[in-house]
Protein backbone atom coordinates (compact mmCIF):
# COMPACT_ATOMS: atom_id res chain seq x y z
CA UNK A 1 0.00 0.00 0.00
CA UNK A 2 1.24 3.49 -0.84
CA UNK A 3 1.35 6.20 1.83
CA UNK A 4 0.96 9.94 1.30
CA UNK A 5 3.98 11.81 2.70
CA UNK A 6 5.03 15.45 2.92
CA UNK A 7 8.49 16.79 2.06
CA UNK A 8 9.82 19.61 4.25
CA UNK A 9 12.80 21.85 3.51
CA UNK A 10 15.82 20.98 5.66
CA UNK A 11 16.92 24.63 5.85
CA UNK A 12 13.73 26.56 6.66
CA UNK A 13 11.32 23.74 7.58
CA UNK A 14 8.66 24.84 5.10
CA UNK A 15 6.49 21.94 3.85
CA UNK A 16 6.53 22.43 0.07
CA UNK A 17 5.73 19.09 -1.58
CA UNK A 18 3.52 16.03 -1.14
CA UNK A 19 4.17 12.65 -2.75
CA UNK A 20 3.32 8.96 -2.45
CA UNK A 21 5.68 6.33 -1.06
CA UNK A 22 5.49 2.56 -0.89
CA UNK A 23 5.48 1.63 2.79
CA UNK A 24 6.58 -1.97 2.18
CA UNK A 25 9.78 -1.43 0.19
CA UNK A 26 11.25 1.73 1.76
CA UNK A 27 11.77 1.75 5.52
CA UNK A 28 14.11 4.75 5.81
CA UNK A 29 13.08 8.37 5.40
CA UNK A 30 13.18 9.86 1.93
CA UNK A 31 15.57 12.76 1.20
CA UNK A 32 15.59 14.56 -2.18
CA UNK A 33 16.91 17.88 -3.48
CA UNK A 34 14.05 20.09 -4.65
CA UNK A 35 13.39 23.80 -5.15
CA UNK A 36 12.24 25.77 -2.09
CA UNK A 37 10.46 29.04 -2.93
CA UNK A 38 11.07 30.42 0.58
CA UNK A 39 14.85 29.85 0.42
CA UNK A 40 14.85 30.68 -3.31
CA UNK A 41 17.26 27.82 -4.07
CA UNK A 42 17.53 24.03 -4.39
CA UNK A 43 17.80 22.45 -0.94
CA UNK A 44 17.44 19.01 0.63
CA UNK A 45 13.86 18.07 1.51
CA UNK A 46 13.16 15.42 4.15
CA UNK A 47 10.13 13.19 4.56
CA UNK A 48 7.69 14.18 7.31
CA UNK A 49 4.52 12.45 8.42
From Swiss-Prot:
Q: Note the PROSITE patterns from the entry.
A: RIBOSOMAL_L33
Q: Which UniProt keywords apply?
A: Antibiotic resistance, Ribonucleoprotein, Ribosomal protein
State the phenotype upon gene disruption.
Answer: No effect on sporulation at 37 degrees Celsius, however sporulation decreases at 47 degrees Celsius.
Would the keyword Nuclease turn up in this protein's UniProt record?
no
Q: Tell me which InterPro entries the record gives.
A: Ribosomal_bL33 (IPR001705), Ribosomal_bL33_CS (IPR018264), Ribosomal_bL33_sf (IPR038584), Ribosomal_zn-bd (IPR011332)
Q: Which GO terms describe its biological process?
A: response to antibiotic; translation
Family assignment from sequence similarity: Belongs to the bacterial ribosomal protein bL33 family.
Q: Which HAMAP family match?
A: Ribosomal_bL33
Note in the entry: An unknown mutation in this protein gives rise to thiostrepton resistance.
Q: What is the protein named?
A: Large ribosomal subunit protein bL33B
Species, as recorded: Bacillus subtilis (strain 168)
Gene name of the record: rpmGB
Amino acid sequence: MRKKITLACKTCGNRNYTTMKSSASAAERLEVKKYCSTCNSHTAHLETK
